[in-house]
Amino acid sequence: VKLVGKSTLRLTVYPAIKDIGFAPGAHYFLYIPDRWCFWESHPFTAASWRPAGPNLTQAPEKVIVALRKTTPNSPQTSSDEEDIKKIRSNEKRKSYRRDTIIITTSTQRKPQRAKLTFLINARRGMTRSLLERITPGSSIEVPCLLEGPYGIARPVPSFPTVVIIAGGVGVSTALPYLMQHLSTRVEITKRFVLIWSVREGSMAEKILKGVKGLGFRQDVVVKVYITRSEEKDSWRLPIGVKVRYRRPRIEESIIKEAKGRVPGTPMAVIACGGAAVVDCARKGTVEALEDAAGKNGSGEIVYWEEGYGW
């Protein structure tokens, strides 16, 4: 368990079984048996999943700068052993050219363990007790029992335009869909928009740095709205992420994306966060539908809601 915000925890679970049936949007019930109320459980949406498998890495083992003679009477090629001997004998570099020899080896490390990651907003009970046991910059290990998965994976990849509105730890629902899209080369989705409102920029930095591929896809737009920023220069977000220092105008954003899509194509809107976030997203979706009602072949808008009340 690590602290990623003033009251936000990142809980990493290493399941004993390799396949736990993870899918974007899945949630699990977590039990912490080292507490007095060990029978208590809380549902949390998984923010990411890494399957078990081999951990094979290939990296340069040695980098050797070889000096080779360039005189007309000298051979143009030589073996690596000869080059190494020349370097070790400290021969003069005059009339020699430099080549780089890179020797790579594949090393087999310990097998990669399956891993589930959860983002938890500490409030009362179990989550508060975890928060009180952690100090900034440190982590703790606790036993954990996992029950799940529950929930339904939405058919997000089948929509040409996807807009996800997230508030706080509600980004747990958005991240698996975002990672799924970034890891897919051929897809139907031509525009993927994530609008995330979060109190602390440092929290956004810690969470988004684990998302690979941000800033390299023109079809992906990530907008982060910092609502309580004190030290703007103390954190950095990945390249390509747009930052605003205010609350997002959720209704306007949804209507804008609905108008900008290709006419006649469907659009998916997912809201994940507290009551204020989902209320605004629902209202914006209705207004976008009403705005498009008079247009012929405007395309449908599908709305899904993942409320966060814990």
What feature does the model see in each segment?
Residues 21-32, 145-148, 166, 170, ...:
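ABC-type nucleotide-binding domain
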Residues 1, 183, 286-290:
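Transmembrane-helix exit/juxtamembrane "anchor" motif
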Residues 85, 95, 109-113, 118, ...:
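Reductase modules of NAD(P)H-dependent flavoproteins
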Residues 1-9:
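Canonical alpha-helical transmembrane segment with a positive-inside/aromatic-interface signature
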Residues 10-162, 226-229, 288-309:
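FAD-binding FR-type
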Residues 5, 16-19, 165-168, 188, ...:
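Intrinsic disorder
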Residues 156-180:
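MIDAS-like acidic motif and immediate structural context at the N-terminus
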